[in-house]
């Protein structure tokens, strides 16, 4: 016994499959933001690793994409103006390799914010990072 399944043209209403937009329009709830409590900040693509699974394509040669000190200063100003923030999530590459990393952490913690460092842990064995775990 063989049967042939119908070919459904997604652009035409068939009654078999409800179009996505119609379903969302019928069942969706309105989403609203209460307040911004967590902000993730990417400090650049510079990293001590070259992982094939890296979603930002970070690596040791990615210096051009590093956040500038001027941008870091502006980020601090914007964060200071947002009273609802409780957490700053620093990521990269290896955020610790950005020259502004420690001053950013110091600034945010000095303002009572929780700081998350998305660390690959191998950075702890890099020259100049020996005290990183104590700093954090």
Residue ranges and their predicted role:
Residues 2-119, 124-130, 134:
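Conserved alpha-helical substructure of the radical SAM core
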